[in-house]
UniProtKB/Swiss-Prot annotation:
This is putative uncharacterized GPI-anchored protein DDB_G0275411. It is found in: Cell membrane. Disulfide bonds: none annotated. It is a lipid-anchor; GPI-anchor. It comes from the Eukaryota. Residues 1-19 form the signal peptide. Residues 323-344 form a propeptide. The keyword Zinc-finger does not apply.
Amino acid sequence: MRIIFYLTLLLFIFNKVKSDNCTIGGLTATSCNETSQQYYFTQDKFTSEDIIQIPFGAKLYFSGDVVFNYPVNFNCQPSLKKELSRFVYEIDCLQVFSNGTITYNAEEIYCSVDFSTVFDIDTMVDKPVDMVESWSRFMKPTKGFGETKVYEPVVYSRIKAQAGYKCDFNPGFRTSRRVPDKYALHSKCAWAKALFPAGDFNIRITPCNLQNNSESVRKLEEIGFDKNFYMEKLDFTPTDGLFYNGNRESIYIRYYPNFEKKFDLSSIQDIFDSYLYIINYCEDNPNKFEISFGMQSDLWDHRAFNLTDFQLVKNVNGTFEGSATRNQISIMVLILSVLLVLIL
């Protein structure tokens, strides 16, 4: 009995010491149980000050309101669930709980999904498999986002597939067929099939004052790019894949990895052609405009988005042609100067 008592005491002391260091994803909790990965925050209002990385299996409990001003990275894994006579995979990335409201003001939310344990590689599946129709409650808390000006944030996907498989990611705030009041992340995985890469476009239109031109905004909405391939960024009002930001007079388009449509400069020519009638509809000097766009090929690392060195301008016959920007010219001048110095 004495031995059991001392063992219990040692376990209590050990757990107490562990709980004194309640740091999770860059946050320090008021208390925690590290064994069960449960972390408790007792503030009346919690506001994030940096990017938060929530490890797989961890749960964060907040007593009051929560405001995420910086990106949050959730980590989750599919689990089998029996539905009627069949089994389906389901992902529930619920890792943040609050007695108050949860508001996402962050530019992005990330969702890391581990699919590596899902497939039986011996089956050699030769067609896309509808692997996950998940409902992810972090995307829209029960009590809403709090502020009406806060739009639903983008979810980046970091998909880890089993060897030989590749998975696409069709994001969106589409209602789950199985759980109508929840939103779904849809993904398909295929064996030995080409997966086209992802990319970003930040299209700036000048001199159109779209913010004060309701007709132009309506024209933008009529384009309706395929929402399976395009997604909004925070502060962009969603339509069917095309998103308008009145403050910056720009359009942001995100192209996710997919099995069906290759992402390259030529594939978006039709997109720019579609803007012709929109731009010409603008009241401010409709015959003079230019479109510049930025491109980022890797969405899986958190990097600042920068406008790149490619610019499109309208020429006399109404088509688009590429032209180097001042940055390109400056770099070329610098290189030539260095070469001349070396030669002389």
